Amino acid sequence: MAGFFRNAPRDVGSFVLIVAAVGFGSGFAGGQAVAAAGGPFLAHQALYELSLVKSRGSNSINGARGRILYNFSGSACEGYTSEFRQVSELDSGEGKVTLSDLRSTSWEDGAGKSYRFKIDTRMNDAESSPVDGVAERAGDHINVKLKQPVSKTFTLDGTTVFPTEQIQRIIAAAREGKTVLELTVYDGSDNGEKIYNTLSVIGQPIPGDRTIAAPDPSTSSGVMKSLTRWPVTVSYYDRDAKAKDGEQTPVYAMSFELYENGVSRALVLDYNDFVISGAMGKFDVKDSKPCK
């Protein structure tokens, strides 16, 4: 899901990653990522309850609440489908409350060569802001065709990855004992033209039998109990922004515990001026067809 949280406002504008943020991965070109990650991703539905952890800076807020509903399904054979909805309410004080409703659907093929996405954002009573497009790998570059918000075609460097591949590579790096991973990511967020440089910091593995201080539906699931997970923090940087004094501040950072089957728990979303937690409130495993 990591890709769909990126529209979250630092100025209490449109709230949402991603994925997403919380992002959930897929294979990259040639199917190497699937083998590297050591197993298929789990088809599932997860509900996250959002709440304000702390507020700071000039654009601080008084309160925040909301929910994220995330559905993930598919396989390396048929591709991966993600459905995401986030409804959030931000209170910036003096009676100013911003209500946002973001819905997105995406499909990414198992080889990481094709990515289709539709994103719709509504703010208060304003009209929706749809983004609709497709990205296809072609040799050493990626061709992007947008239908909305405007009809447009442009190219990206071939080293850029899509959201599912991003998570797949993080899992592969974690299995190899790596602690840092840099990737350039495209997920169609914002106006469909934004590209992000990401820095993932991976902590030590957490075995499935370790006692959990704050359990949730994923940790009590029989499917999940024996699985290893890793604490991960992914920072997203605007590729077009200029660094100040040699350093660049991330647009936002997302921390979470990432299971080896792609499920994420214990979300913490840091938007610089405020921090929001996403506690898993519900978790359901979905039926899926094995890859033949």
Tell me what each language-model feature is:
Residues 66-73, 101-108, 133-135, 254-257:
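Hydrophobic/aromatic beta-strand elements that line small-molecule binding cavities or substrate pockets
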Residues 37-43, 71-80, 107-113, 223-227, ...:
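A short, structured loop/turn motif at beta-sheet edges
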Residues 2-17, 26-27:
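Bacterial N-terminal signal peptides that target proteins for export
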Residues 120-292:
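Mature, soluble, non-transmembrane domains
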Residues 31-79, 83-97, 291:
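N-terminal cleavable signal peptides for secretion/export
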Residues 48-53, 84-89, 117-122, 232-241:
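Short beta-strand segments that buttress and anchor functional surface loops
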Residues 84-137:
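Hydrophobic/aromatic-rich structural module bridging two neighboring secondary-structure elements via a short loop
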